[in-house]
Amino acid sequence: MATTTQRRLEPTSIRKFGTGLGQFDLPDLTALQTVSYAAFLQEDAASNARKDHGLESVLREIFPIASYDGNTTLEYLYYELGKPRYTIQECRQLRLTYGRPLRIWLRLNREEPIEEEVYLGDLPIMLGGGEFIINGAERVVVSQLHRSPGVDFVLEQDTTTDRKLPSCRVIPERGSWIEVNVTKKDALTVRIDQSGKFAATMLLRAMDPKYSTDADLLSAFYETGTIKVNGGKDATKIENKIAVDDVVYPSGHERAGEIIVEAGYKITTELSETICNAGVTSVEAMDLPKVPLIFNTLADDNTASHEEALLRIYQRLRPGNPPQLEKARTLFQEKFYDDNRYRLGKVGRFRLNRKLGLGVEETVMTLRPDDMIAAIRYLIDLFDADSGAEIDDIDHLGNRRLRTIDELASEELRKGFLKLRRTVQERMSVKDAQDMTPRSLINPKSVSAAIDFFFGRGELSQVVDQTNPLSQLAHERRLSALGPGGLNRKRAGFEVRDVHISHYGRICPIETPEGTNIGLISSLAIYAGVDDYGFLCTPFRKVIDGKISDETVWLRADEEGESYVAPADTEVKDGALVPGPNMIARFRSDFEIVMPEQVSFMDVAPAQMVGVSAGLIPFLEHDDANRALMGSNMQRQAVPLLVTEPPIVGTGMEREVAKNSAMVVRARRAGKVTYADATRIEIGSDHYPLKKYQGLNERTCQNQKPLITVGDKVEKGQIIADGAATQKGELALGRNVLVGFMSFDGFNYEDAIIISEELVRNDTYTSIHIEDFDVEIRETKLGREEFTRDIPNVSEKALRNLDDTGIVQTGTYVKPGDILVGKVSPKSKTELTPEEKLLHAIFGRAGEDVKNDSLEVPSGIEGIVIDTQKFSRRMSLGEDERKAFERELKQHETEGNEEIASTFESLIRDMEEASGVKLKDSTGTPLADGQDPKFVAERATSFRLELVLEQIEDEEKRKAAEKVHQTQWQNVEQAIDERDRKLNSMKRGDELRSGVLQMVKIYIATKRTISVGDKMAGRHGNKGVIAKILPIEDMPFLPDGTPIQIMLNPLGVPSRMNVGQILETHLGWAGAKLGFQALTPIFDGASESEINDCLAEAGLPAHGKIRLTDGRTGEPMEQETTVGYIYMLKLHHLVDDKVHARSTGPYSLITQQPLGGKARFGGQRFGEMEVWALEAYGAAYILQELLTVKSDDVEGRTKIYESMVKGENTLEAGTPASFDVLTNEIRGLALNMQLEKRPI
């Protein structure tokens, strides 16, 4: 019989398939989060060298704050971030936020300026690849994909005429939207936000006095000129022209000053003769335009000046207010020219310039009148179909951009600082000038509340999916179109959800949820990056005259639009593209056969178009897209197993995913391993504590194991310890199992899976899950609660696992109902039952005043207690407790000093080695002389580098010593901070929630072996539920006697069109036989002929089929079966978490029916359709029982319980409580409904 060691596959070599074109180095997969948050904080930059970005930008925008009278101003100088008060572990255990204090330096300008530091709250610290610890839980802020600020031109269907009319929207980063539409009467109208429509020329008049008159507006859009006329003979010169300005009778004429032709009107033959005969010498005119939009708009515009236009727009925006010119001017100024209220933003200005061909500086953030003129000109060109103007595709990634955490956090903090500004101005007006200080003016709660809301409760702040390393990495790279300022899933249409050609290399076309969020939640492609404007870009190799250059360029979607892009697997010879019928290139959304000279760019890798999860699916190109979507989503649900194993058939991405995941440990610096065990690793002066059996967000288990031994040399960034679901630094989500695609007595009907008992016996798919429970002690009105072993009315047997303080002992195996922590609460005197009163009268008053409030193991949980932790506030201590506390404090101080002394002496020795000088302090005592640790720690605290460098005369050696100090001093600082933090923490006690005096946390490890009902899946979307576990002897076996481990239904392949699983099976079989791991990158992997060659080399049939023998009968199977090794995952949908049965439990107060759901220990709903089923069978008594005594007949429940106790089989059904609710509802409608009971 096969044993674990025989069936565990250990490949001895690696075979890489494909052309090897995907050698382009992968970028840092977590950069989307880490780089943007670093840009937001700018913590490494000097306070006076910070860019106007992120937090710095918000502070510069809000400050200075001036008082209402202008006499006092509060100026911002700089900000600094302190050190965190708590460790990561403390924050997890005590449900705190892991952050660092934000302090800003402010100057209050009055008669005597005051500079002061003000604390504004804690800013969360980013861990790993983008997680924050907020209130004890790890969260991530998902990046938002939204419609970019700028100008968009679209065609909209007119419902009455069926014409497609162009419209334009000017969308700012902050402020009012302006929408310009072409009406069915061929005029231009404008809407500001949701205001009523008015003529577009009215807005232009209001924006700038230089566009006050019709002549000014016509001159802005068309070529105009002055035509000289002299008598009637020149009448033809101005005939059929358009008058740009009013033509009036000249002075000296009997009708002097009267208008002959108004501006914007056509000069007819009759009018031209009148003008010439009247003695007019010159006419401002223009040719009749092809598109009459402006003329039609001027005809609709009943304003004639700048002031009149302002008043009309004011009436539209404030319909109820009386029109006043100054108020109208102020409103218009605030709406479009005030930086605080209207801001196009850097991106908006960039897009305006790009679309309209403007060359305006990007620092100009407001909308200029010339911008609106240019936008309307473009709209006129769109109306003229022959002009070549193009409408915008709003789903194109050139028009959608990414808002990363720096922008999202800045926006939320800005709201908090605006509240702060109002508060400061109010306080300035009521406080006496002499008593004012920055601290007395600032209320930090408005800022800290904004920080707490954004990171803790914001729509884009989500609890990290930590099922396995891939799920965490994928969550950090997720893009959402939902959230504040984004789309609504109910109103989002098909177009915005669909895959777009501009997604190529930027957004994964495969990875997206299957439900209502499909297409709205997406994932970043492997090589994609974000540029300074927030647009997604992807790398390409530059091709010049058919030759591939070494230059790599990162292009936005709009930059790529007009170029031919060759795929990565294009045939190349001597660095040049090979012409021929196979020379294809992508141009926009089409592939064309082209000449090499036409190609401008080339993909950097075949896997460029997909995301991380899809990049892990071997033979992805042979799978249907729907199944690939399921495969990439289900890999994120794979549970980390007890014994990990990388896939025999991989894509080469497995190592990259593990390396970029926060679950493994990577070396911060190169060096030599000085210490390594299961709990910590030391490389020189760097210390790496390892996490042991730590529960993650999804209750999966993180247990880090070292990969190196003492004496090994490691490089910077090398993986030195494995985490959950990794092996030797490679992602290992499942196990390689021997599969047979065959039906088996119908047990694998409808995708059900049959597995061998061998997988259960050998713990192949066993996983560990960590559950944590906590219980708190509070001060109640009746007295204080207490942890104790002395619990009333509880047997000694139930207390056997508790220690003297009432806490369960580590290592105890617990089951549902077992006591984890003994706790008693004060009990009100009125709560005593008559029986208790009698007992207290007989046995005295002991135990009378407390009730049992212990923490018990809930149903469905069974396992071993792996850790218990007790936290308490530092309260008044007794004499013995105080002495014990002082001893512990002294011990921690000694340990801290020893750690500081060790790191400091290591630094000094390395500096002495680099300089060749014995370094001394100011008294002449050697710095590293192995003295008392306390003395050395004090010396380290007061250490000054310049005093030491003065002792080194040689310039080069001084620089070498300084370099050693730069690399190692932070370890000394870290040791000092750790000692001080630990001592301060002990002195002040644990930071528990308000009202909590003590808290105990219990961690239970549950071992889950694979069982019937568990969900399993491959990487190709081939999922199923285990229907049967067969004994090993009943499983079909190969000719050499090896039993099959898992049987899948062959009908699951053709209709699902995921043939990749069959290719994986064949190559996996060859790999297992020959002892190699196959790396077959997507779109550039092993071909069919290469797989056949591998099978032949292994001595296996070329078609991958073999005749199996039935283990039950010993007879050979009738047909040959496809057999091989496939990588199968156990998913997080475990049957143990879902199976639930109710005996007695809570009832709904109103209907008196049992509650629903496992969490509430609810019942199974017997619904309408189930009632029909019993009615169809005529099972009247069963139905009566289900709808009354088993549900909400309160009296009937009591009676049937009594009859069961007496052993009688009687059923007396009464009226269901829900029926009483119905009758009361009807009576509430003033209908007198009465029940009449008749004997049956």
UniProtKB/Swiss-Prot annotation:
<dbReference type="InterPro" id="IPR007645">
    <property type="entry name" value="RNA_pol_Rpb2_3"/>
</dbReference>
<dbReference type="InterPro" id="IPR042107">
    <property type="entry name" value="DNA-dir_RNA_pol_bsu_ext_1_sf"/>
</dbReference>
<dbReference type="Pfam" id="PF04560">
    <property type="entry name" value="RNA_pol_Rpb2_7"/>
</dbReference>
<keyword id="KW-0804">Transcription</keyword>
<dbReference type="GO" id="GO:0006351">
    <property type="term" value="P:DNA-templated transcription"/>
</dbReference>
<dbReference type="InterPro" id="IPR010243">
    <property type="entry name" value="RNA_pol_bsu_bac"/>
</dbReference>
<dbReference type="InterPro" id="IPR007641">
    <property type="entry name" value="RNA_pol_Rpb2_7"/>
</dbReference>
<dbReference type="InterPro" id="IPR037033">
    <property type="entry name" value="DNA-dir_RNAP_su2_hyb_sf"/>
</dbReference>
<keyword id="KW-0548">Nucleotidyltransferase</keyword>
<dbReference type="InterPro" id="IPR007121">
    <property type="entry name" value="RNA_pol_bsu_CS"/>
</dbReference>
<comment type="function">
    <text>DNA-dependent RNA polymerase catalyzes the transcription of DNA into RNA using the four ribonucleoside triphosphates as substrates.</text>
</comment>
<dbReference type="Pfam" id="PF04561">
    <property type="entry name" value="RNA_pol_Rpb2_2"/>
</dbReference>
<dbReference type="InterPro" id="IPR007642">
    <property type="entry name" value="RNA_pol_Rpb2_2"/>
</dbReference>
<dbReference type="InterPro" id="IPR014724">
    <property type="entry name" value="RNA_pol_RPB2_OB-fold"/>
</dbReference>
<protein>
    <recommendedName>
        <fullName>DNA-directed RNA polymerase subunit beta</fullName>
        <ecNumber>2.7.7.6</ecNumber>
    </recommendedName>
</protein>
<dbReference type="InterPro" id="IPR015712">
    <property type="entry name" value="DNA-dir_RNA_pol_su2"/>
</dbReference>
<dbReference type="InterPro" id="IPR007120">
    <property type="entry name" value="DNA-dir_RNAP_su2_dom"/>
</dbReference>
<comment type="similarity">
    <text>Belongs to the RNA polymerase beta chain family.</text>
</comment>
<dbReference type="Pfam" id="PF04565">
    <property type="entry name" value="RNA_pol_Rpb2_3"/>
</dbReference>
<keyword id="KW-0240">DNA-directed RNA polymerase</keyword>
<dbReference type="GO" id="GO:0032549">
    <property type="term" value="F:ribonucleoside binding"/>
</dbReference>
<dbReference type="Pfam" id="PF04563">
    <property type="entry name" value="RNA_pol_Rpb2_1"/>
</dbReference>
<dbReference type="GO" id="GO:0000428">
    <property type="term" value="C:DNA-directed RNA polymerase complex"/>
</dbReference>
<comment type="subunit">
    <text>The RNAP catalytic core consists of 2 alpha, 1 beta, 1 beta' and 1 omega subunit. When a sigma factor is associated with the core the holoenzyme is formed, which can initiate transcription.</text>
</comment>
<dbReference type="InterPro" id="IPR007644">
    <property type="entry name" value="RNA_pol_bsu_protrusion"/>
</dbReference>
<dbReference type="Pfam" id="PF00562">
    <property type="entry name" value="RNA_pol_Rpb2_6"/>
</dbReference>
<dbReference type="InterPro" id="IPR019462">
    <property type="entry name" value="DNA-dir_RNA_pol_bsu_external_1"/>
</dbReference>
<keyword id="KW-0808">Transferase</keyword>
<dbReference type="GO" id="GO:0003677">
    <property type="term" value="F:DNA binding"/>
</dbReference>
<dbReference type="GO" id="GO:0003899">
    <property type="term" value="F:DNA-directed RNA polymerase activity"/>
</dbReference>
<dbReference type="Pfam" id="PF10385">
    <property type="entry name" value="RNA_pol_Rpb2_45"/>
</dbReference>
<dbReference type="InterPro" id="IPR037034">
    <property type="entry name" value="RNA_pol_Rpb2_2_sf"/>
</dbReference>
